[in-house]
C-alpha cells in the first residue's frame, strides 16, 4: 500500500511539475512573439509613413499626422517631431493607465520615431514612386495606409501601441461611455482636416483614402491573423 501511495504521489507531483513547465514554455513563446511583434510593427508603420505618405504629402491621423504637418510647414525632422508629440501623451497615460502601459507605449513610439528617421534619411523622404503622377499619389495612399495599418495592428498584438492620440482616445473612453474607436476616428479626422488647411486640399483627400486603408488593415491584423 505504501508503494502504491508513493507511486501515486510521484505521478501527482510530476504532473504538477510538467504542467508548470508547460505553462512557462507557453509564456516564453508568447513573450518571444510579443518582442517580434514589437520590433516588426514599427518597421512596417515607418515604411508606410516615410516612404509612401510623406513624399506624397499624405497625412496619417494621430501624433504622426501632427508631426507630418510640422515637417511640411517647418522642415523639422519627422521622426523627432513624432517622438516630441508623443511624449506629453505618454505622460497622460502614466496617470491614467499606469507605468507598465506607459513604458510599453514609450518603447513602441520610440521605435516608430527611430525607424521613420532612419528610412527618411536613407531616401531623403523621396520614396519609391514618382509623385508627379497623380496615380502614384493614389498608390502611395493605398500602400502607405496598408503598411501603416499593418504596423499598428502588429504592434498592438504585442500589447503595446505606437502612442499618438489613441492614448487620449483611451483616456476619454476610460471615463466616459464613448467607444475608443469613435474618439480615435474623430481625432484622426481633425488632424487630416488640419492637413487640408496647412498642406493642401488634394493631399487631404488622398489622406482620407489612406486613413480608411490603414484602419481596415489595422482591424484585419488584430482580428484576422
Where do the PLM segments sit?
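Core subunits and conserved enzymes of cellular information-processing
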Residues: 5, 10-225
Amino acid at each position: 500500500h505504501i508503494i502504491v501511495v508513493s507511486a501515486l504521489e510521484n505521478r501527482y507531483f510530476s504532473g504538477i511539475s510538467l504542467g508548470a513547465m508547460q505553462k512557462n514554455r507557453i509564456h516564453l513563446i508568447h513573450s518571444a512573439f510579443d518582442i517580434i511583434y514589437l520590433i516588426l510593427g514599427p518597421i512596417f508603420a515607418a515604411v508606410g509613413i516615410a516612404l509612401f505618405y510623406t513624399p506624397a504629402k499624405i497625412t496619417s491621423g494621430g501624433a504622426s499626422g501632427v508631426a507630418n504637418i510640422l515637417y511640411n510647414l517647418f522642415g523639422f525632422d519627422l521622426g523627432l517631431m513624432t517622438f516630441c508629440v508623443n511624449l506629453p501623451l505618454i505622460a497622460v497615460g502614466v496617470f491614467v493607465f499606469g507605468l507598465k502601459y506607459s513604458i510599453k507605449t514609450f518603447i513602441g513610439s520610440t521605435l516608430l520615431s527611430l525607424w521613420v528617421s532612419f528610412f527618411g534619411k536613407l531616401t531623403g523622404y523621396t520614396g519609391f514612386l514618382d509623385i508627379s503622377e497623380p496615380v502614384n499619389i493614389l498608390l502611395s495612399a493605398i500602400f502607405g495606409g496598408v503598411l501603416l495599418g499593418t504596423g499598428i495592428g502588429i504592434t498592438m498584438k504585442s500589447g503595446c501601441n505606437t502612442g499618438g492620440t489613441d492614448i487620449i482616445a483611451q483616456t476619454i473612453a476610460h471615463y466616459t461611455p464613448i467607444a475608443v474607436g469613435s474618439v480615435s476616428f474623430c481625432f484622426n479626422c481633425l488632424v487630416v482636416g488640419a492637413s487640408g488647411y496647412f498642406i493642401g486640399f488634394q493631399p487631404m483627400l488622398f489622406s482620407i483614402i489612406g486613413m480608411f486603408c490603414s484602419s481596415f488593415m489595422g482591424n484585419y491584423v488584430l482580428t484576422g491573423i
